[in-house]
Structures are given as structure tokens and as C-alpha cells.
Amino acid sequence: MEEKQREKVVVIIGPTAVGKTKLSIELAKALNGEIVSGDSMQIYRTMDIGTAKVTADEMEGIPHYMIDIKDPEDSFSVAEFQELVRGHIREITKRGKLPIIVGGTGLYIQSVLYDYQFTDEAGDTAYRERMEKLAEEQGVEFVHKKLEEVDPESAKRIHANNVRRVIRALEIFQTTGKKMSEQLEKQKNELLYDVVLIGLTMDRTMLYDRINLRVDLMMEQGLEQEVKRLYQNGVRDCQSIQAIGYKELYRYFAGATSLEEAISQLKTNSRRYAKRQLTWFRNKMDVAWFDVTDGEKTAEILRYIEGKLQLKSNNN
């Protein structure tokens, strides 16, 4: 029997502020592509400035998916992300287009490309309800500490406010005796798609300068007002507000810090996150890195993708 041809996928990764959005639009135009956001925070409506969401003008008519699909109060799991993005890959491919995933959330992107299993076969409704009650009565930190005791790796990865996922990890351990973190690590080395992983990097000093500048620009664009609306609307203890740009300003609105200190912390956290992103991708995935310190490398990257996926661009 002839082996089913794997779907072609391009993935663009790299730290925040390195230029992924601009490159993705150029590649989509050249390769007849459509774009899927791989950022776990761009899914939230009304959280536009702080998540550096692509604007309608920037899209240049290229369809984008996985943006504005949840309210800030909603939780969102890696398993949901995996299912939705794989669906978009199928649909985009069926239309004869090339799926281009753009983003910086490493685990989420990895869960799509590799054979990560998030099965629902392990379930214990009574236990789940008991944990939900405990979270209500004793607080989310109490339940999170229980997870720390049995699966410290998952506890590190899952924020206490993401109660549903904390309880899911506890439930998996309760019913199977296996840690969720171990199950996530068990993946096939083989990619599910015919994929090209493009990574953008640049001189660290220049990158950090760009990140600082981006934060200043976000403040000019109204980030303070965007976060204030969420705060005044009573959005609390949610997964969404753990995003960089939101948690720092929440502390300001709660009276725990000055605006100046909050902005400084936001810059620091953004730089640290960029460093973690680079480290994660270098350690976990087979990425073709392109240094854009001296300017964009669109033509070079395009040639590389054409060669790897045996595609012809509209630029030829």
C-alpha cells in the first residue's frame, strides 16, 4: 500500500520582537500560504496590544487563524490547541494552500508537530469533582501544592490559576499512576508532517533594545488602558492574565507597585522570556536558524523552504 503523503507545514519560531510577523506575511504571499498563530495568548479577545497581535493592515489580506477565539476568562489547554491547529492544517492543505505556523510558545508548537497524546480515557469524575470543591474551599494554591507533591514537573509548567489543567494532571496521576509530565515527554521522534522549522535570531543586545522599544511602543498604543479594562471588568485569577504585559500592570492596578516599576518589570520579564524561548527551541527542536542582525533574510529563507519542501514560490 502506498504511504500517505504527509502534509507540508512551515513553522517560524524565535524570540519576541525578532520579526516573525513580517517574515510570515512575506512567505505566505510568496508560497500561497495561510497563517496559524502559534502563540498561546493571542487566542484571547480584547488582549491585542500586550500580545502583539497582528493588525488587519499587517495581514495584507492573508488569512490568519487561532486569533481571538476565547474570552479572557476562559482557560485553554495544550490539548485544545493541538486539536484546533491540526484541524487548520488539514483544512488549509485541502484548499491547496501552505500552512505557516508562527509563534513562540514552544510546548504548544511541539504538541502539534509530534505525536503527543492527550487521551481522555483516564477519567475519574468523582475525584475531579472533589478536587474542584477543594479548589473552591481551600484555594487554587492548595490544589496546586497537591500536584507539586506527585508531579513537580507538571506543577512547574502549569500555573496555579489554570485550575482545570492542574486538576487534569492530578486526575491522570490518580487514575493511571503516571505523571502527566512523563506522558508529554513520551513522543515519537518522527514528525507527523513534512515540516520546515525556521528560527530567527539576532545579536542579543540588539534584540533586547528592540524588546525595550516594543514595550515603550505598546504603552504609547494604550497597553495601560487595555489592561485597566480587564482589571475593571473583574477578570481575575485567569490563565490569560499570567501573560507578560498583563501580570505586571495588574500589580500596578492592585496598588502593589508604581507604573514606572511595572513597566521596568515588563521589560525585564520580556527579555528573560526571549532568552528562555531561544534556549527551549535550541534544546528541543531541529531548527534551521537565520541570523537577522544585519537585516531580513526573506529571500534566503524562501530558497531554503523551496528546497526542503520542493515548492515553487510566486517570486520565481
UniProtKB/Swiss-Prot annotation:
Keyword field contains Nucleotide-binding: yes
**Biological process, per Gene Ontology:** tRNA modification
The protein's matches in Pfam families, at most eight in alphabetical order, are given as:
IPPT (PF01715)
Q: Which InterPro entries match?
A: Dimethylallyltransferase, IPT, P-loop_NTPase
Q: Which residues of this protein are annotated with the site description Interaction with substrate tRNA?
A: 105, 128
Q: Which cofactor does it need?
A: Mg(2+)
**Has the keyword Nucleotide-binding been applied to this entry?**
yes
A GO molecular function held by the record: tRNA dimethylallyltransferase activity
Where substrate binds, per the record, is at 16-21
- Detail which positions bind ATP: 14-21
Show the segment(s) annotated as Interaction with substrate tRNA.
Answer: 39-42
Q: Which reaction does it catalyse?
A: adenosine(37) in tRNA + dimethylallyl diphosphate = N(6)-dimethylallyladenosine(37) in tRNA + diphosphate
* Paired cysteines (S-S): none
EC supergroup of this enzyme: transferase
The record, for Gene3D superfamilies, names:
1.10.20.140, P-loop containing nucleotide triphosphate hydrolases
**Keyword set for this entry?**
ATP-binding, Magnesium, Nucleotide-binding, Transferase, tRNA processing
By sequence similarity, the record places it as follows: Belongs to the IPP transferase family.
User: What does the UniProt function comment say about this protein?
Assistant: Catalyzes the transfer of a dimethylallyl group onto the adenine at position 37 in tRNAs that read codons beginning with uridine, leading to the formation of N6-(dimethylallyl)adenosine (i(6)A).
The subunit field of the Swiss-Prot or TrEMBL record says: Monomer.
What this protein is called in its record is: tRNA dimethylallyltransferase
Organism for this UniProt entry = Bacillus cytotoxicus (strain DSM 22905 / CIP 110041 / 391-98 / NVH 391-98)
